[in-house]
């Protein structure tokens, strides 16, 4: 029998959007595939992606990732035009597209990119249906996080 291939060392995560969880309430998460060109796959394998300002737009019954930057490698071909910020099509089932379209038609909701990662040999993106936070909500989140740290520090010192 043949041995199973062990996966490559390192993380499968290519890029994270940490700002999304700070600026939005994430209500639903969906995994989607990406339609990529060859040079984009090579750049993603090198980890040259940024999804911090990216979001999803719906056009003609399809979902597209807008604002994601994939920086081309220096060794990319000269006869291929590399557009780092091109709009990329998301690969979703019709049922998922209809569900997503219904959720974002509500007032104040949008779809943001949360993370970009490898699943087996395929590049996947996790998108989230999100509602924007107000300033006081952001302050409450920071206050809760700091209180957790203080509480852990107090408990650590109390157990000595």
Swiss-Prot record:
- GO cellular component annotations, sorted alphabetically? cytosol
Predominant place of localization: cytoplasm
Entry keyword annotation includes Amino-acid biosynthesis: no
> InterPro entries in the record, alphabetically?
SmpB (IPR023620), SsrA-bd_prot (IPR000037), SsrA-bd_prot_CS (IPR020081)
Q: Which keywords does the record carry?
A: Cytoplasm, RNA-binding
SUPFAM superfamilies found in the cross-reference section: Small protein B (SmpB) (SSF74982)
Which BP terms in the Gene Ontology apply to this protein?
trans-translation
Q: Where in the cell is it found?
A: Cytoplasm
Gene Ontology molecular functions: RNA binding
Instruction: Give the matching Pfam families.
Output: SmpB
What domain of life?
Bacteria
Q: What does this protein do?
A: Required for rescue of stalled ribosomes mediated by trans-translation. Binds to transfer-messenger RNA (tmRNA), required for stable association of tmRNA with ribosomes. tmRNA and SmpB together mimic tRNA shape, replacing the anticodon stem-loop with SmpB. tmRNA is encoded by the ssrA gene; the 2 termini fold to resemble tRNA(Ala) and it encodes a 'tag peptide', a short internal open reading frame. During trans-translation Ala-aminoacylated tmRNA acts like a tRNA, entering the A-site of stalled ribosomes, displacing the stalled mRNA.
> Which family does the similarity line name?
Belongs to the SmpB family.
The protein here is known as SsrA-binding protein
Q: Which organism is it from?
A: Proteus mirabilis (strain HI4320)
Gene that this polypeptide is encoded by = smpB
């Amino acid at each position: 029998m043949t041995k199973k291939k062990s996966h490559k060392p390192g993380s499968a995560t290519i890029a994270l959007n940490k700002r999304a969880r700070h600026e939005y309430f994430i209500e639903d998460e969906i995994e989607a595939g990406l339609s990529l060109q060859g040079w984009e796959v090579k750049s993603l394998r090198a980890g040259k992606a940024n999804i911090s300002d990216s979001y999803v737009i719906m056009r003609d019954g399809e979902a597209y990732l807008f604002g994601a930057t994939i920086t081309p490698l220096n060794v990319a071909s000269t006869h291929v035009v590399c557009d780092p910020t091109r709009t990329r099509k998301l690969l979703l089932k019709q049922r998922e597209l209809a569900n997503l379209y219904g959720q974002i038609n509500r007032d104040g909701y949008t779809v943001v990119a949360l993370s970009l990662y490898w699943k087996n040999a395929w590049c996947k993106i996790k998108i989230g249906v999100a509602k924007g936070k107000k300033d006081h909500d952001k302050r409450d989140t920071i206050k809760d996080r700091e209180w957790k740290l203080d509480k852990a520090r107090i408990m650590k010192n109390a157990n000595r």
